[in-house]
Amino acid sequence: MAGKDRILILGPTGAIGRHIVWASVKAGNPTFVLVRNTPGSNNRVNLVKAANPETKEELIESFKNSGVNLIQGDMNDHESLVNAIKQVDVVICAFGRLLIEDQLKIIAAIKEAGNVKRFFPSEFGLDVDRHDSVDPVREVFEEKARIRRIIEAEGIPYTYLCCHAFTGYFLRNLAQIDITVPPRDKVFILGDGNVKGAFVTEADVGTLTIEAANDPNALNKTVHIRLPKNYLTINEIISLWENKIGKTLEKTYVSEEKVLKDIKEASFPNNYLLALYHSQQIKGDAVYEIDTAKDLEASEAYPNVEYTTVDEYLNQFV
């Protein structure tokens, strides 16, 4: 019986990448990460303060102790990238929004290596082929869609992973700006609060990504993570929270017109976060029918995966 595929994670120390690494190790896949000989700059402004306390150095040491294979290399060194890719079967990219175009370097290296069974480009959000978002989010989605088209044109085997709303961005503050825990007095709700959204923890994204990587049925498909107990409206989530704290929050409903105005007037990261919230809570970009010829619903494809529900996730803040 053949062993499990060897998996390379690019961007392994990010908010999602680390969870993919840990899930790969747990699943028994030989796991590889690309690490730079010299540290890169980190002067960018993050969307939210990471809930993950580990430094990159601590993560790399943790990976090493877990049996992860560390490959020295650099995204800007084509030869080292090709060398890394030749050692594996599956390549998973978990780059942030500022590095989407850098995936062109990965695509070129995959083409030269000629051995990759599957490439997961950096998606991990809403479906970039099904959305009605506004800038600055739309610009990022269009970049990701362009990467999809290049992958397809080059004939590279792929899986696209659409996980919608991370709990770290959307749930730990009930999609409120400038706070890091759920509010206990008042809450702002975009639109009428009755549009379904899909929520998932970063750890569960890691688990489901590796499930898809080990699933031949996910080849050249888009995997959609819309877990049944986490497919909720913001009103339903607020009701769950109110029941936990035994208090009714003061609710202010914000019109789409006002949200769009706020997006234009806000600076980063608030304009980006508001555009994400607008996409899911007002435009309903997590509400659609899948095409079984090219899509998989994760909860149906991997029914044995136990996941953290929204209800369970909120317990830590009570």
Curated annotation (Swiss-Prot):
GO terms for biological process: defense response; lignan biosynthetic process. NADP(+) binds at residues 11-17, 36, 44, 148. InterPro entries: NAD(P)-bd_dom_sf (IPR036291), NmrA-like (IPR008030), NmrA-type/Isoflavone_red_sf (IPR050608), PCBER-like (IPR045312). Pfam families: NmrA (PF05368). GO terms for molecular function: 2'-hydroxyisoflavone reductase activity. Keywords: NADP, Oxidoreductase, Plant defense. It catalyses: (3R)-vestitone + NADP(+) = 2'-hydroxyformononetin + NADPH + 2 H(+). It is an enzyme of class 1 (oxidoreductase). Its EC number is 1.3.1.45. The active site is at residue 144. Reduces achiral isoflavones to chiral isoflavanones during the biosynthesis of chiral pterocarpan phytoalexins. The reduction product is a third isomer, which represents the penultimate intermediate in the synthesis of the phytoalexin (-)-medicarpin, the major phytoalexin in soybean. This is Isoflavone reductase. It comes from Glycine max (Soybean). The gene is IFR.
